[in-house]
């Protein structure tokens, strides 16, 4: 996720500067990237965030909304398939928000978190279209504007080991007004 955010932060800085000249949203293609996770298990009712926020340079112009869309291929060794999950994002430090410190990650009650996707069901090796920032595109924008963000997931069904998410053909739609 850090690769996505670093790449998108650079592109978004340019995009925000260009979009400031018009009121239309700007579409910015992002480089392909992968995220690997040792194991994913059922966390229904809880959102798991990485211990540290993704950090990057703030854009020169504040961003109002961001939506990321593209293809995701998920590969894993199933323990219980398929993986059904929803993605979340936050800009406030989970440690200061009453989340549980689980060593390598933060565990937060999903009821108090902000979803940035609908629910997705991933079969092993399947590729599908995903959108992050729908609903709540402003939380991604707030993270870009602050220069840090935590992106996590709630797994409502399934468990797997050796999970890899390959994000391809990703595009950021940016609005600055």
What function would you assign to each model-found segment?
Residues 22-29:
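Bacterial lipoprotein signal-peptidase II cleavage site
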Residues 29-51:
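Post-signal peptide N-terminal segment of mature Sec-exported envelope proteins
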Residues 165-177:
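Short, low-complexity, Pro/Ser/Thr/Gly-rich segments in the mature regions of secreted, periplasmic
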């Amino acid at each position: 996720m850090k690769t996505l955010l670093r790449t998108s932060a650079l592109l978004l800085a340019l995009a925000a500067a260009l979009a400031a000249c018009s009121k239309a949203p700007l579409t910015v293609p992002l480089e392909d990237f992968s995220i690997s996770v040792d194991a994913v298990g059922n966390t229904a009712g809880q959102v798991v965030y990485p211990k540290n926020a993704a950090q990057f340079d703030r854009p020169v112009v504040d961003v109002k909304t961001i939506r990321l869309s593209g293809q995701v291929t998920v590969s894993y060794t199933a323990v219980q398939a398929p993986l059904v999950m929803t993605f979340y994002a936050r800009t406030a430090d989970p440690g200061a928000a009453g989340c549980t410190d689980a060593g390598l990650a933060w565990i937060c009650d999903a009821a108090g978190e902000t979803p940035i996707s609908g629910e997705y069901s991933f079969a092993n090796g399947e590729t599908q279209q995903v959108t992050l920032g729908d609903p709540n595109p402003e939380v991604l924008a707030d993270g870009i504007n602050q220069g840090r963000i935590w992106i996590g997931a709630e797994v409502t069904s399934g468990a797997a080991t050796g999970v890899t998410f390959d994000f391809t053909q990703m595009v950021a739609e940016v609005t600055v007004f």
